[in-house]
């Protein structure tokens, strides 16, 4: 495989990648604002959460599969195929006649969106040298930050002035622009050979991971028998998958790749960091509102510090590589991450939200450095034909960590409420948390607020422990690991990673 993008064409390729990323990044935030209107017109409130879960489950499950397909058939055709599938799902979502049909069409959207994040990151790894990659990835991280702010505003404007269908149809022009940009400016010369797609492996992987993600998502709501069945499906299909992959000619997941020390430790560190980070975003806003008694706007500002810190640190990572080396850059991120988490332990009912914002910002900076250094290190350790799979493994680990973190933090909060609250107080607290304006009333009730404060500390301790484990895992990453085998002639050789 040879990428023949000219220097003049690279800005157009990165612009196309940014538009593609925007489609994936804005999905959750733009839909959330419009959901009350959609439910009001379509009915079926019981499907509310599945409008989000279906998209995320499909996206997470297909990430690894798309990474492998991009190694077999090239980045451009695989990414375009994913975008087309996303656009088909978006078009159908606008014509949904019920919440059940909307969930199905969101599933189709997610199946397409699974291609965007791993393949765009892989294209950056293909086109940019090590010292340039941080700036390019910083631009992509900036798209995520902007999407977090603009998504809710765009959703509100569309619902107020147009049909809610346009929150999905807005993807159509964006997708067309992206496809045109990729067709015109991203050129690949694919080696002509008949690739054997591991259909059974892809099916088993999808069933196993899908069962795990549904199990984690519905752990506190589904009947015990269903959870047990999901657990059996996860274990059985997962075991079959592992046995099958060891003998498949072109395994959808290369066990050899995933068990390399560099890939394995990077994925573990990313999974732990993703778990800790979703823990922060889950519990910090409700603490600021329910315990500190601040407005949703203030609570959102504390998380905005995280959204600023992440892309900011990614943008400066290239300069840090050149000045201090990639190993020290990774170590700096691993130190900032638990320091930021430790700020949570000093929060109390009389604390300033600034304290929470500083901790959030430091965790964002740490996560940015950890994610970008792990990404470039993995990408530079493998040849072109494995780079898509390696990149996808890292993104999948972060996605799985996010799902684990949401479940873990909910469990810790419930344990804390049960431990610190008497029967009446615990019941009252649960009732308030289930009300739209419950956090406002909660902060005014001193006894309930005290229980909530203590209960949330269990979650804070969990975030700190995960951040410390992330620190340990990053120090186990063998930075400087070189490619095991030389790339084929005509491919971009891995760049050496400085110590």
Task: Say what each PLM segment does.
Residues 63-200, 218:
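Helix-loop-helix hairpins in multi-pass membrane proteins, especially solute transporters
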Residues 2-8, 177-206, 222, 246-264, ...:
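Flexible interhelical linker loops that connect adjacent transmembrane helices
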Residues 2-13, 17-19, 437-499:
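Transmembrane-helix exit segments and adjacent C-terminal regions of multi-pass membrane proteins
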Residues 173-190, 206-218, 233-247, 470-478:
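C-terminal membrane-cytosol helix-exit motif in multi-pass small-molecule transporters
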Residues 60-61, 91, 149, 206, ...:
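Hydrophobic/small/kink-forming positions within alpha-helical transmembrane segments
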